[in-house]
From Swiss-Prot:
GO BP annotations listed: chromosome condensation
Family: Belongs to the histone H1/H5 family. HCT subfamily.
Domain of life: Bacteria
UniProt protein name: Histone H1-like protein HC2
UniProt-recorded Gene Ontology molecular function terms: DNA binding; structural constituent of chromatin
Region annotated Disordered, chain positions: 1-70
Organism phylogeny: Bacteria, Pseudomonadati, Chlamydiota, Chlamydiia, Chlamydiales
Species whose genome carries this gene: Chlamydia trachomatis serovar L2 (strain ATCC VR-902B / DSM 19102 / 434/Bu)
Keyword field contains Transmembrane: no
Role, per record: Might have a role in establishing the nucleoid structure of elementary bodies.
Compositionally biased region (Basic residues): 1-50, 59-70
Keyword Repeat (UniProt): yes
Keyword annotations: DNA-binding, Repeat
Amino acid sequence: MLGVQKKRSTRKTAARKTVVRKPAAKKTAAKKAPVRKVAAKKTVARKTVAKKTVAARKPVAKKATAKKAPVRKAVAKKTVARKTVAKKTVAARKPVAKKATAKKAPVRKVAAKKTVARKTVAKKTVAARKPVAKKATAKKAPVRKAVAKKTVAKRVASTKKSSVAVKAGVCMKKHKHTAACGRVAASGVKVCASAAKRKMNPNRSRTAHSWRQQLMKLVAR
């Protein structure tokens, strides 16, 4: 417990009756202006207090106490007699005589080379081949048989076909006929020599130039 505890009241708070205080009606009293009385100033005569002359204090004469110088006692130094230690004379080491060991040169054993006796293989003397005598076969000259030429009677194209071709305006060749075919047929030639043969040839290789020319012709039409 720190400090003194405050004593608590023994009265019970429940026993107290709660008194409802009514606010008292304030009386509106007319305030009087306070009249200040001017107090008459009394002239108090000041008495001059006589100053007491305090006797000057005499300085207390200090006693000159002679300071004694501290006397230092000289401590007598003990002279310790040092014993001279006799130095042990170490016997000088004699250098150990090195035994001159003769170094043996490592003897290399030369391996005895075995002389392998090479057997000389007897070369077989191959019998020289005798050139086989070619048989002189008599070449028979090829006998050409004279083929009897058949006298083929040339068929003269009938004038009927040519007249039909002329009327149709085409030649006698089986191909894509052009305007040139009619001119050829009119002249009496049966086979046309126009460019239609080259155009219809399956082995013909087309080039960019030929394609361009063909397109130009188609556009012109």
